[in-house]
């Protein structure tokens, strides 16, 4: 089987590449990535010499290039991780999110229609559902929860999801969609909460926390997410959406305090900054459907996963220190210096 993995040099995509090459050593994995600021080719160094792996630098919006790749590789399955994903950046510049997340998705599905595939899988987010109130811990997102987006990012992902389902109904394209909660683990880009706090804490820099840090997220270890997608593309029902959650709800401030504790850093590093515009209060996923239909359950408890994640960042400091130099510093100063 040949699988095209878009966005495979990013956080979740690269972990999925590693998982698939290990779990299915006879599969051919073709990684397509534009290598934007969040894509890092060095992440894929461990598999570059694998004869069943190929990397192609390509923008999913490049229709001619995508069609050429399909002609060459004749993929059986496409898994689309490629996306602009940082909410703060979407607030600053929505257009690139619409281009990549919606138009890029359309190009990939058009290629699937033109050349024929067994399965197209869209990797999406629980953010398409909006948020839940903090005072209703009994409420969870299900696959039937209406789409109610809060940011340009989540709106672009919701638009892509609706387009995927429309291609299924209109053209009969064999699609599935997964909507995950917040991922964490190795190779997470340092602009996101957990790696940002780890990197800053190690450097004894301020730990910027939006608002009062009361926002709640459901955390999913990236390896568990990869296993869920593996199951969906092999056994998931065509035309269906599957929620993938970690059963690990935590307040942002509690995560930051835990990171301080694990690294032996004082909580005095925590600095409360002006809240994000339209900041969602609580995400919580009900993964009953994927459990009942496919037998998937998250294996990693947050207490264990965060220890593994922190240790990975301690052991791989060159990887993230190379990233946070240069352009990233300009972005960081813009985001946090005057808040």
Q: Model-derived features: where do they sit?
A:
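Residue-level recognition of oxygen-bearing side chains
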Residues: 65, 96, 103, 146, ...
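C-terminal substrate-binding subdomain of Rossmann-fold SDR/epimerase-dehydratase oxidoreductases
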Residues: 3, 19, 29, 58, ...
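The catalytic Tyr-centered alpha-helix of NAD(P)H-dependent dehydrogenases
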Residues: 137, 149-156, 186, 190-194, ...
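Residues that form or flank phosphate/diphosphate-binding pockets in enzymes
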Residues: 12, 38-39, 64, 188, ...
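Hydrophobic alpha-helix immediately C-terminal to the catalytic Tyr-X-X-X-Lys motif of short-chain
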Residues: 159, 163, 167, 197, ...
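N-terminal Rossmann-like NAD(P)+-binding domain of SDR-like oxidoreductases, especially those catalyzing
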Residues: 1-183, 308, 313-316, 322-339
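A glycine/serine/threonine-rich, flexible loop-to-helix segment
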Residues: 47, 135-136, 190-198, 274
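Short histidine/acidic/glycine/proline-rich micro-motifs that form metal-
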Residues: 35, 182-185, 215-216, 276-277
């Amino acid at each position: 089987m040949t699988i095209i993995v878009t966005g495979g040099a990013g956080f979740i995509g690269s972990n999925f590449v590693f998982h698939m090459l290990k779990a299915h050593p006879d599969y051919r994995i073709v990684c397509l990535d534009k290598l934007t600021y969040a894509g890092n080719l060095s992440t894929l160094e461990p598999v570059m010499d694998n004869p069943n792996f190929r990397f192609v630098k390509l923008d999913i919006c490049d229709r001619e290039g995508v069609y050429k790749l399909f002609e060459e590789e004749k993929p059986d399955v496409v898994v689309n991780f490629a996306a602009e994903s940082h909410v703060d950046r979407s607030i600053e510049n929505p257009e690139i999110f619409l281009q990549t997340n919606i138009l890029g998705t359309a190009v990939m599905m058009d290629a699937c229609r033109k050349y024929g595939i067994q399965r197209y899988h869209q990797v999406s987010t629980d953010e398409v559902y909006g948020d839940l109130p903090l005072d209703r811990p009994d409420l969870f997102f299900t696959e039937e929860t209406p789409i109610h987006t809060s940011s340009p990012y989540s709106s672009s992902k919701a638009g892509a999801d609706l387009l995927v389902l429309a291609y299924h109904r209109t053209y009969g394209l064999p699609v599935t969609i997964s909507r995950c909660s917040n991922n964490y683990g190795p190779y997470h880009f340092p602009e996101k909460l957990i790696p940002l706090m780890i990197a800053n804490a190690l450097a004894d820099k301020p730990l910027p926390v939006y608002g009062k840090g009361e926002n709640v997220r459901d955390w999913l270890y990236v390896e568990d997410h990869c296993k869920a997608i593996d199951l969906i593309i092999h056994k998931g029902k065509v035309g269906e959406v599957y929620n993938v959650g970690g059963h690990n709800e935590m307040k942002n401030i509690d995560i930051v305090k835990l990171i301080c504790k694990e690294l032996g850093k004082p909580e005095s590093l925590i600095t409360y900054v002006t809240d994000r515009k339209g900041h969602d209060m609580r995400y919580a996923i009900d993964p009953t459907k994927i459990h009942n239909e496919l037998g998937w359950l998250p294996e990693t408890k947050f207490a264990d996963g965060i220890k593994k994640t922190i240790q990975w960042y301690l052991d791989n400091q060159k990887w993230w220190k190379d990233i946070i130099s240069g352009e990233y510093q300009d972005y960081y100063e813009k985001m946090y210096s005057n808040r």
